[in-house]
UniProtKB/Swiss-Prot annotation:
Pathway: Amino-acid biosynthesis; L-tryptophan biosynthesis; L-tryptophan from chorismate: step 1/5. Part of a heterotetrameric complex that catalyzes the two-step biosynthesis of anthranilate, an intermediate in the biosynthesis of L-tryptophan. In the first step, the glutamine-binding beta subunit (TrpG) of anthranilate synthase (AS) provides the glutamine amidotransferase activity which generates ammonia as a substrate that, along with chorismate, is used in the second step, catalyzed by the large alpha subunit of AS (TrpE) to produce anthranilate. In the absence of TrpG, TrpE can synthesize anthranilate directly from chorismate and high concentrations of ammonia. This is Anthranilate synthase component 2. InterPro entries: Anth_synth/Amidotransfase, Class_I_gatase-like, GATASE, TrpG/PapA_dom. Keywords: Amino-acid biosynthesis, Aromatic amino acid biosynthesis, Glutamine amidotransferase, Lyase, Tryptophan biosynthesis. It comes from Vibrio cholerae serotype O1 (strain ATCC 39315 / El Tor Inaba N16961). The gene is trpG.
Length: 201
């Protein structure tokens, strides 16, 4: 069981995700991104088996309150999973570039090819996924490995050593097949060999 510290970027999908994680047996505590990074770090210190989940939300990753600072502080110290906007923030935190996807995608089902990483264990490729985004990772830094794509667009990334992964799509959507399994796999992977550091500097 994970203790999930959930960063809410003021998004309508937040409680769908929270309900999904709770139905998988995890404890979820929600913190909005208008809190300070210091306050969230202090909350993390109280948790066993912590995993930080970065929610979807409106706007650009740089406009998400404490989230960019929090990512810089926590990467390599706590496992993290980013979804949509959270995924884009992960890409930027590791030095990548997020820009316009060329079209606005709102509620579109796409067939995604994945690389059989552990987060996709037991899942078919291609996999039907739900997309709601206008931005996409256009330059992925060497610290991140692309694990899935749709027509050359990056749909997920991981940093294996830091136990950080990002999904551009929405696993919690009813339009994503096997979404619950994907989220369960992601938590299992995040906790499988967590980063060695346990203290926040």
């Amino acid at each position: 069981m994970a203790n999930i510290l959930f960063i809410d970027n003021f998004d309508s999908f937040t409680y769908n995700l929270v309900d999904q994680f709770r139905s998988l047996g995890h404890v979820v505590t929600i913190y909005r991104n208008n809190l300070s990074a210091d306050a969230i770090e202090q909350a993390l210190l109280q948790l066993d088996n912590p995993v930080v989940v970065l929610s979807p939300g409106p706007g650009a990753p740089s406009e998400t309150g404490c989230m960019p600072e929090l990512l810089q502080r926590l990467k390599g110290k706590v496992p993290m999973i980013g979804i949509c906007l959270g995924h884009q923030a992960i890409v930027e935190a590791y030095g990548g570039v997020v820009a316009g996807a060329g079209e606005i995608i709102h509620g579109k089902v796409s067939m995604m090819e994945h690389q059989n990483h552990a987060i996709y264990r037991g899942l078919p490729s291609p996999l039907a996924i739900a997309r709601y985004h206008s931005l996409v990772a256009t330059q992925v830094p060497s610290a991140l490995t692309v694990t899935a794509e749709v027509n050359g667009l990056v749909m997920s990334v991981v940093n294996e050593a830091d136990k950080v992964c990002g999904f551009q799509f929405h696993p919690e959507s009813i339009m994503t097949t096997h979404g619950a399994t994907l989220l369960a796999n992601a938590i299992d992977w995040a906790l499988s060999s967590t980063p060695a550091q346990t203290q926040f500097a």
